[in-house]
Amino acid sequence: MTTQIHPLAGQPAPASMLIDVARLVSAYHADVPDPTIAAQRVAFGTSGHRGSAFDRSFNEWHVLAITQAIYHYRKAQGIGGPLFLGIDTHALSAPACASALEVLAANGVDVMLAVNDEFTPTPAVSHAILTHNGGRSQGLADGIVVTPSHNPPRDGGFKYNPPHGGPAGQKITHWIEAEANRLLEARLQGVKRIPQAEALRAATTHRRDYLNAYVGDLGKVIDMDVIREAKLRMGVDPLGGAGVHYWAAIAERYRLDLTVISEVVDPTFAFMPLDWDGKIRMDPSSPFAMQRLVDIKSRFDIAFACDTDHDRHGIVTPGVGLLAPDHYLAAAIDYLFQHRPGWAQHLQTPAAVGKTVVSSRLIDRLTATLGRQLIEMPVGFKWFAAGLQSGVLGFAGEESAGATFLRRDGSVWTTDKDGIAAALLSAEVTARTGFDPGQRYAALAAAFGSPVSRRVQAPATAQQKKQLAALTPKHITSKELAGESIESILNHAPGNGEPIGGIKVNTAGGWFAARPSGTENLYKIYAESFINDAHLQRILSEAQAIVDAAISQERP
C-alpha cells in the first residue's frame, strides 16, 4: 500500500483544475438531492455534513432540512438563547448561510451574524457560545459553522455546536441527521422559510463583532507580552480562510511583528499549491499545501498557517520547515504544563492531557513524565468538549493538527479546535524558552525516543468499511506484528470506552490503527515505530494484510 504522489503536487493549480464558482452555486440552488440514494442523504461525519453541489450531496435542500432539524432539536432541548452563525470562505458557504438564515428567521430564532458579513473562524464561534453561556443555566446559546474545513473548493460543509461550544456528539448528530432526512423524504414539508431579504430585516437577526470579541480575549490564553518583548519576526499564511482579517487585528492590538503573507480571498483557491493527490486542499499539515510558506521560512523566527475555518494549524520553523502535527502537539504539551501556573492555582485537580488513539505514543511517555493523566479518545474533537469545559483537560489535540487549551487562569477558552491560539502558542514557546518548537521537539525525541510515523490509505467497499468499523480483538488472529509480540488490541478508546470505529494494535516498539473513511470508499492506516523506518514499513505492510484478512472474513 503506497501513496501515489501526483506529479503536480506542491505546484500551482492549472486553470483547468479550478472550479467554476458560478456553476457550483447554480447547482447548489437548482439541483435537488434524491434521499433514496445514500450518497445524497444528510450524513454527519467526524465534524458535520459535507459534500458538493455537483454531486447533489451538499445542496440547498440539505441545508434547509438540516437547519429545520436543528430548530426542532433546540426546541426539544429547551435551548432558547441566540444561535451564533459563522461561515468560512468556500464558495458554497455564503449561499448555505443565507439558506440557514431563511429557516432560522422563519422559526423565530435569534441569530448572531458577523458585522459586515465578516468571515468567522470556528474558534470565534466556540468562543462566542462559551462567553454567552458563562454563568447561565437558561437562555443558552449554540452555533452553526458553515464550513467543510480544509476540503477542496467544490465542497460545502455544515456543522452544529451545542451549548458546550464544541462539535456536537454522536447522539445529537444522529438525531439531527434522522430528522433532516425525514424532511428530505417529505420534500421539505414542515420546513419553514422566508425570503433572504426579509430574514436579514427580521427583529431576530442581529450583528456581532466576532473579530474584536475574539481578538480582545486572546491575551487571556496566550502571553502576548513575552512575544512582543522578544521581538520575534513572525509570518502567517491564512490560506485564504475565515481568519484572513483576524491576523492584522491581532498584530495591531498586541503590537506584534507579524507579517500576513497574503489576505487574498478567492473561492477557487487558485493561489494554493496542489496537495499530494493533485487536489486543492487547504491543509496546513500538508507539506505540499504549505509549500508557499515553507519556501520563505528563513524570513521568520517562527511562521504558521491555518485551514479554511481556522480550527487547524501548521507550524513552520527555520530549521525544520513544516513540523509534523504530533511533533508540535508534543512540544506544546511539554511547554504548557510547565508554564501555566494559573492552572494549578485555579483548578481543583491537575489538568489532564487529551489525545486521540492515533496520536503519537511519545505524548504518552511525555505526559507520564509530567505527572499528568492521559485521556485517550476516539478520533473526533467532540470527545474532548466536556473535559475542556470542566477544566479536566488542560490541553486536547489531534494528529490531524487540531488543538485547543485552557486560558492562562485555567478557565475554558474554546471547546472546539483553535488554529489561531495553537499557532500563536508556537511564538510564545519560542519567545519564552529561546527555542522554537522544532528544537524543543528534538530534545523530547532525544529523551523519549524518536518515532517515525505515517498515515496511508487503501480502497474499501461500503461493506468492508462496515466490517472494519465493527472489528473486535477476536477478529485479529495474528500474534505478532513486525517481529514483536502483540501486547494489546483495542476497539474502544481507553479514555471513555467509546468505539474507535476500527482497531488499534500495540507492540512494545510500535502500533497501528485502522479505521474507515467517513466520506470516501477507503480505509486509513496510521502507524508508528520507535525502532526505525524499516520497522515502520513492516508494520504498515503487515497491518494491511491483517486488516484485509479481517474484513474479508464472513461474519457470523
Where on the chain are the PLM-derived regions?
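An N-terminal, well-structured beta->alpha segment
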Residues: T2-A106, L200-M234, A242
